[in-house]
Regions:
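Protein-protein interaction/assembly regions in multi-subunit complexes
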Residues: 1-312
Length: 312
């Protein structure tokens, strides 16, 4: 992958300007970042795979609270909402997995008490202290315990299981086509951008550079797992169908685009993602050794993402 290069890797700290009257709401532990970098000589499938993976396909640590571990005499508190709220608290990803958190509080005032995450912290802070967990009525009490768990962002109802937000992948070497301009030099269908600028924001739970390298490592592992599934391919003459359960458009698009680039004479190569489960199906019409085709495509992609990791 000597022609592939990563350039202009930039990280900007996103420090909010907060009025003095709102200083009590300012972040205390986490610092958000905006990361931008450019990949030269790669396909849109590669840049899009990184974008998709950093947004929702990395496993993310979060605070998990069991329903039974929430005990309160406040009738306005709904345990399910507290569970959801706890999941939404951004948590440092280097938090030891055996870390336990607990909260035991009574509102002895005459006003509604906003309970902040500061009340959860014991020792080293792993999240901001100024996030409101719940509002406790006068004279009421609450106890809860939480532990560190992890989940993927694409799983529904798991709140803050993401490391990057507002991620974009924009081509820099091809002018976007105007569909209404009949005099346009080239239609987007025929363009093949090879320079991609990737930009994303973080919530401060993991350094930007580590997010990118983790995404590349994640994609490499998923590609390697495809090699172990080649024996499951169904075929009819020279038509081959490979279904990858537990994966998404990310891998499907990567493989089909790479097959198309490495084997331009292949008769047909398409993929489709299931609408009801996490699975992607690849269909290829090829007259020679199909295993060699897949192995070459996967090895090429593995080298591509290793090269990106080394240059970050």
């Amino acid at each position: 992958m000597s022609n592939l290069s990563v350039k202009d890797f930039k990280i900007v700290k996103l420090i909010p300007k907060i009025p003095d009257r709102l200083k009590h709401l300012a972040p205390t532990t986490l610092t958000s970042e905006r990361c931008t970098f450019t990949i030269h000589n790669c396909s849109n499938a590669v840049s899009n795979a990184i974008r998709r993976t950093i947004m929702c396909e990395l496993k993310v640590a979060y605070l998990h609270t069991e329903y039974e571990d929430i005990v309160t005499d406040d009738p306005f508190i709904i345990p399910e909402m507290i569970q959801k709220r706890m999941r939404m608290i951004p948590l440092l990803q280097n938090t030891p997995p055996d870390t336990k958190f607990s909260l035991d509080i009574t509102n002895n005032t005459l006003d509604v008490l906003d309970v902040k995450t500061k009340s959860l912290i014991r020792g080293k802070p792993y999240f901001d202290e100024t996030i409101t967990i719940l509002s406790l009525q006068p004279g009421k009490s609450l106890k809860l315990s939480a532990r560190v768990a992890s989940e993927y962002g694409y799983i529904p109802h798991y709140g803050m299981c993401a490391l990057a937000f507002n991620a974009t992948s924009i081509c820099k070497d091809v002018t976007p086509s105007n569909m209404y301009d009949e005099a346009a030099e080239s239609k987007s269908h025929f363009s093949d951008p090879r320079v991609w600028e990737i930009t994303f924001n973080t919530n401060g739970t993991m350094p930007s550079k580590q997010i990118v390298t983790s995404a590349c490592s994640n994609i490499i592992d998923r590609l390697k797992s495809v090699l172990s599934l080649l024996y499951t391919m169904a075929h009819n003459d020279n038509q081959y169908v490979l279904t990858i359960y537990g994966d998404s458009d990310t891998i499907g698009n990567l493989l089909i685009k790479t097959i198309d680039e490495l084997y331009p004479d292949v008769e047909a190569a398409t993929y489709s993602a299931s609408a009801i489960e996490r699975a992607v199906t690849l269909r290829v019409i090829y007259g020679d050794d199909i295993n060699t085709l897949y192995k070459n495509a996967i090895e090429h992609l593995i080298e591509t993402f290793k090269s990106i990791m080394e240059q970050i």
